[in-house]
Amino acid sequence: MCSSDLTMGAPYFKQKDLFRRAGVVCFSSNYELYADMSSRVMTTLEEISPRVEIYSIDEAFCDLTGVRNCRNLTDFGKEIRETVLKRTHLRVGVGIAQTKTLAKLANHAAKKWQQQTGGVVDLSNIDRQRRLLAIVPVEDVWGVGRRISKKLNAMGIKTALDLSEQSTWIIRKHFNVVLERTVRELRGEPCLDLEEFAPTKQEIVCSRSFGERVTEYEQVRQAICSYAARGAEKLRGEHQYCRFISAFVKTSPFALNEPYYGNSASMTLLTPTQDSRDIINAAVKCLDKIWKEGHRYQKAGIMLGDFFSQGVAQLNLFDNSAPRAGSEKLMEVLDRLNAKDGKGTLYFAGQGIQQQWQMKREMLSPRYTTRYSDLLRIR
């Protein structure tokens, strides 16, 4: 089976026969395991490099300023790779360059030609840099994507090298300042700083497709309560309070002979909160505004916004909406117990017990690193 046979993002059931014929082993999404292994990789990188930006769950940028003075960069990249492999048993690609955009391309090459490169590519050499840029399609450049690449192709810009040689004035005129920065980065001019601390989130969204179509209000309400509780937990992790809360529901837009229905509702609290009880209560009120019987719902979710760094807002003279007494201490206990004894140790009754609406993960691999019950047993 070759990659051209597969369609990215297509549902499993549509490609199940293809997988079976090719002997492909499939697993359900194991978010808990992914997050824990990601944390171990990032912790390892932070021990090796003085400055690290965690870009995503499986990607990070390391500042190697000054390393060249005492180490060969390719050797240092191999050391990073070997250390991560030793501690986590995960193979990573290492791309080294003067800018983030070039480092992403170097990483792309390290993964694509792993046998030839040993999983490490250093683009410090300008000639090597240009050779790689000449064979990389422009759509593979970080931040370009399909829509912009089509317009670039129409202008005769086919490769990353072609893009790097364009006038920044023309690129800015026909596109935007973001693509202009990409051109400069491809030339080795740093335009994107390393962000050691993630910027404060402007919103938090918690949503998931149901394991099967849901028709009962109670099941959707349980899902909304669970997403609201998770959103509140994330909010406290960001040391933020929110005032804006919304909930949404939708049916599948692809269902045959079924009318599509999707809707959302929101409300703004007078006093900012990070209390799960307030957020759950508001989210359920939003659900009640948009709930319609007779639909087979595919997905639901909540969004939190209008953040404050502390639970204080300007009240009117006759307002009587003080924060709950003991709220912060109670939420601290809730989060501490769930962190210590496992998620879901303490939960709100509104979240339900059996949760039949949960996403089906029938091929879930064990969560070896976070659950004692999933540890391997030696007989």
Predicted regions and their residues:
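Gly/Gly-Pro- and Ser/Thr-rich, intrinsically disordered tail segments characteristic of DNA damage-repair
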Residues: M1-R184, A322-R379
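Residues in well-ordered beta-strands of folded domains
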Residues: F27, D63, V183, V205, ...
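Short Gly/Ser/Thr- and Asp/Glu-enriched loop/turn motifs at secondary-structure junctions
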Residues: Y55-E59, A97-K100, Q240-F244, H295-K299
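Short, hydrophobic beta-strand segments
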Residues: A60-G66, S264-L270, A313-D319
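Short, glycine-/Ser/Thr-/acidic-enriched flexible segments
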Residues: S252-F254, F307-S309, I353
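C-terminal hydrophobic structural anchor segments
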Residues: V284-K340, G344
